[in-house]
Amino acid sequence: MTSFDSSPQFNVWRTLLALAIVLVMLATSGWTAARHQRGDTNPLQRALNAWSDGRFQGKALPDADAPSAKLAGFFASLSRAQRLDLAERYPLAVGNMNGAPPKLRYRANRIALEEAVVVERERVRDHRLSTEGRQEADRRMHRFLSLLHPKRHVLAFDPTGRGRVAEVFGNLNRAARVSVVVPGIDTDVLTYERTYRTFSAPAGMAKSLYKAERAQREGSLPRSASGAPRVAVIAWADYTSPAGIGVDAVTAKRAEDGAVRLSDLVRSLPGKKSVALYCHSYGSVVCGVSARDLPSRVTDIAVAGSPGMRAANAAQLGTGARIWAMRDQDDWIGQIPNLELAGVGHGTDPVSAEFGARVLSANGAAGHAGYFEPGTESLDNFARIGVGAYQTLRCAAGTNSCYHDAEDVVSA
């Protein structure tokens, strides 16, 4: 969230200027110039091509884009040794394959990360690159090494371009409820986690939410037979977010691409567990676009610091999930005009009365990047949604009915 962490007033004016620039671009050059993206071959695509051309035990491998249920059936038909063999042959493909067992994806992505470390280490030593290029390679190498820590569970990894990653906190197979954190702009492998302002980065957000959900569950319910609270949280930085405040940040293209990926992830989660989405900033645009196509297992969509959800009101999202919204009083995004004109802007403010969301307190969040900070009412509310303890939610000031028809569903 690099751009959204800087001076509020500066960002407000820069966003308004960006809106004007986009309109000029669309009028003079059309969508093509604004949306042009490099189409170079990339590591993940090469891996998928190899999978497509590969054979296993004399038979063609299933389409990597097949429905997750079909892929799950394929992997279930194999022995453990056969599954590991495929992960070692095609680590990037298997590691990003919805339908593959989570533990197999973790294993495949460890192999892919190890290979990516080798690539970046060679780039660090390549003096044909600029100093800046070698420094970036060094940062990427250390990020990949961090993700290789034995206790980390990487569900998706793509080193292409700015990079994408998704990580699981908790036991995804045993969890009764799963929370998915969907971050906003400037999210990539380098900004995925931070030492400074830890809880403004996807990894920090998800880890903070996981700890808060465990605390909520431990404080209100008996533990499960295993002795551990049955929740899991996914830090989902597995879409290409807008880079900075510009054309992509004020239009829906990145959100539309991300929405497909988000829906695929949710459908592929093992078992029949319920899912809650936590959508921050531009991530709320992704969640808004995806809402209509999400499966019914998604029971809650909570947005924080939202520029809009590409809908005039909550009903227009077309989902049966409960829609929650919050915004800290010091969040600069509240100063951005909520509009949608010629595809620019993201529509009605989700915390406004006319939108019709259930508005929650965000006390203590202290601006745009603080919603997942420990000790805030925003994080406490997120955690209560995550464990299904709706009757203990704290509504926004001036309201007392945000949870009036939401029954607690927490179970051991």
Regions inferred by a protein language model and the residue ranges of each:
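Structural motif
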Residues: R177-S179, S274-A276, D300
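Flexible, membrane-associating and regulatory peripheral segments of lipid-active enzymes
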Residues: M1-T198, L393-C395, T399-C402, A406-A412
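Gly/Ala-rich beta-loop-alpha elbow adjacent to hydrolase catalytic centers
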Residues: Y278-C287
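Aromatic side chains
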Residues: W51, W236-Y239, Y282
